[in-house]
Regions:
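Small/polar/charged residue-enriched interaction surfaces, especially the RNA/DNA-contacting tracks
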Residues: 1-174
Length: 174
């Protein structure tokens, strides 16, 4: 009987640990989202050779470093986080990731780009995706792997949404 009890209690412990990992990752994402946007911009500026583009990136960086600009950016990030679970349930994970990627336009420091990276880093690791998660979902994943990735994304977004609502300013509706 005690062996059965150990096996039964081991499962919730493992689930609790996974939930704690998700919560920690989501907390780190929400707490560091603006800093990650700033780091992306700094990196892009360092590698940019075209003067006009570099000037535009520097202007965006200066804006993010202001209190008002940072607050506005966090509000937009939080707004996207709050909407994303319904996007996934309505359109699917692949289409939602494509939406984030399109809205991010590969622009460093864009809230959609930062959230895309948060989701793809976490979900990609959990489902052992090779390379870019979106590409893996479209080209390689089985339907079972796609469902697992979707469930993992929704579970992470549950935590991201909670922490965004608690920690980030309300963004204006898009």
């Amino acid at each position: 009987m005690s062996r059965l009890r150990e096996e039964v209690t081991a499962v919730p412990s493992a689930l609790r640990t996974l939930e704690q990992e998700r919560a920690k990752h989501a907390w780190d994402c929400v707490q560091n989202c603006l800093n990650q946007a700033i780091q992306q911009l700094e990196s892009a500026i360092a590698h940019e050779t075209e003067p006009r583009r570099r000037e535009d990136l520097e202007k965006r960086l200066r804006n993010l470093r202001t209190e008002e600009g940072g607050k506005e950016w966090k509000g937009r990030y939080g707004s996207v986080v709050r909407k994303l679970p319904s996007y996934i349930l309505t359109n699917g994970l692949g289409q939602t990731l494509a939406f984030l990627k399109a809205k991010g336009k590969g622009e460093p420091g864009n809230e959609h780009e930062v959230l895309y990276r948060h989701l793809t880093d976490w979900v990609g690791r959990k489902v052992h995706a090779d390379g870019d998660l979106l590409s893996w979902l479209v080209n390689t994943a089985t339907s079972q792997q796609y469902r697992l990735a979707t469930m993992e994304a929704l579970a992470l977004l549950q935590w991201l949404k909670r922490f965004a609502e608690a920690e980030l300013p309300k963004g204006r509706e898009e």
